[in-house]
Amino acid sequence: MISAPVRVARPDDVTEVVRVTNLAYVVESFFIDGERTDEAEARALMAHPQSTFLVIDDPAVKGRLLASVYAETHGDRGYFAMLAVDPAHQGTGLARRLIQAVEDHCRTAGCSHLDLDMINLRTELPAFYARFGFQQIGTAEMGDRHKLLQECYRIKMSKPL
């Protein structure tokens, strides 16, 4: 078990956030053309005042991340996306720790609900998030479609905090 703490990402973590996110999201290459994110997007998300990335460092390699997640708050609702764990460390509880950290972060910010969405083609994800208490609350069309290789839509899930 990896005991490194969850912490708030710093601006100098952007390259590693992008690396671990793109590595984890290679599984989406059958419906997304190119990488999941880039440094410009990560910097823009990190700069937003109600947004943050939470990360877990690799205790064996200075400056390397094992996992990251994006979180934001809007009034009484929290939201997270881009949950990413280095494939070599998936199944070790890092995702669970990050989800718990997002929940704690959002509760501290005064949120009463936590939301997420996923692409319907990732058929394993609704059951994964249901294990953490999330329930499907609806669907939505995809916004930016320029990288899509297949038709898809977003599944929206939420849970009370």
Language model segments and positions:
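Extreme N-terminal starter segment of soluble prokaryotic enzymes
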Residues: 3-6
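Acetyl-CoA-dependent GNAT
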Residues: 8-14, 18-90, 96-101, 105, ...
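Short amphipathic helical patch at the helix-1/turn junction of helix-turn-helix
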Residues: 85, 119-120
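Conserved short alpha-helix immediately C-terminal to the canonical SAM/SAH-binding motif I
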Residues: 98, 122-125
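Conserved GNAT acetyl-CoA-binding A-motif
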Residues: 106-118
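Conserved catalytic-core motifs of GNAT/GCN5-like acyltransferases
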Residues: 115-119, 126, 130, 135-152
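Terminal substrate-recognition subdomain of acyl/acetyltransferases
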Residues: 149-161
